[in-house]
Amino acid sequence: MNLASRMHGPHKRSALMRFSMSGRLTPLLIGLLCISLVGATLEFGHGHLHVLTAKINPQVVIPQYPNGPGGQDVLRLSRTASSIGEDPEFLSVTLLPGRGMNVFQIMALVPGRGDVPLLASPSLASAASLLNGQGVDSSGTNSTALGGALLLPWARRLTGAPVSSDASTPLLQTEWQGQMFQVPADAPGSSTSVEGLLLKQATSTVQTEVLPDGQSAFAVFQPGSFSGQWPSSLEITVRVELEAHDLDLTMTAKNTGGRPMPLGAGWQPIFSLPSSGRGSALLMIPSTTVSEVDHGTMLPTGRTVSVAHTPLDFSSAGGTRLGPGGIDETYTDLHKSPQAAEPVAELRDPASDLLLRLVALSPSITNLHVLAPLNKNWISISPNTNFDDPLGPEWASPHSSGMVTLAPGESLQWKVRLEIGRISTLAGAN
């Protein structure tokens, strides 16, 4: 038989074709399906169904970096860019579980600029030498000079009487409701403290999980009374959630001791300003009042003053240029934006059409401390529950300083959201 007859003449059906047309294929397929379902049920009964699920829906491996500051691995949450370079989006957040979950770095994809670090931080290798827990860092104070330190059980500074000038462990004594206690001073012989006691604390546990468009981490700290440096015992949890355009940070502090305690919380992120310089950056702060400072003591007076229509007024909806001058102010009486239920601060880079929005999601956040030193290419915008020197005598009542009193069993939650997007799209939501 030639090729033509093979192609056009009568030919035998294949065995598979004859079988499929015989009417016996459908019952066979149904039988195979039933066997598969029985197998899956047996796997579930033996606790193996998660293995099958993992093969179908593999979990993203979250890399960890050994020998991190504080003796715990550095943790990096990451995600894959999804906008194909059309919109700015978060790519990763690097955390230091051995140093109070310091938000060490936030990376973003910015159209026209590529991968951009949003926080002013050195390399991890350099950070390891700075965050060594020795000398000036004996109480963790170097954590406030990079990345974004989480601040508990108070934000900013306490004041008191120096009780130890030992360079390795300088202390000061302060008072709350008749109780005297000692906290680390920021320098030998200093009457001001470091910014909280969480700075060099290591986590007790850290868990991670995959989100629909990112990853999250949940850390637990069990510092107790910080070796007797605080009036009662604490349990602290920190949750970090990374997605394309949102980065949520949540801290919850619970009084697990038998006595009341004062408590405040905050975050000190140090944002890198645009490469084109601070003169091109625009800042919007939802307030026209600041905490008044006694320029002799550099401590608050307990009063607020208006800065409306002055160089310190950054309340314009479109933002105001930073300019070359320095800023070191605590903005109070935060007002909500017209389209949002919470106060919103903004940092804009018109050259890149980049907008960062810092949203105070907890009503306990009473102020934003803004620090932008003269001729430096960074700015810190700190959402805090308490003001500077919150246990000082200048406050009319303990609660007017922003510190809350936690009875045994009570908790305080602090939560903020960092949003990223284009000025042209997100600004209208302000």
For the regions a protein language model found, what residue spans apply to each?
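Surface-exposed acidic/polar loop and edge beta-strand patches at domain peripheries
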Residues: R18-D248, T256-P262, G266-N430
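N-terminal Lys/Arg-rich, disordered targeting/topogenic segments
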Residues: M1-S22
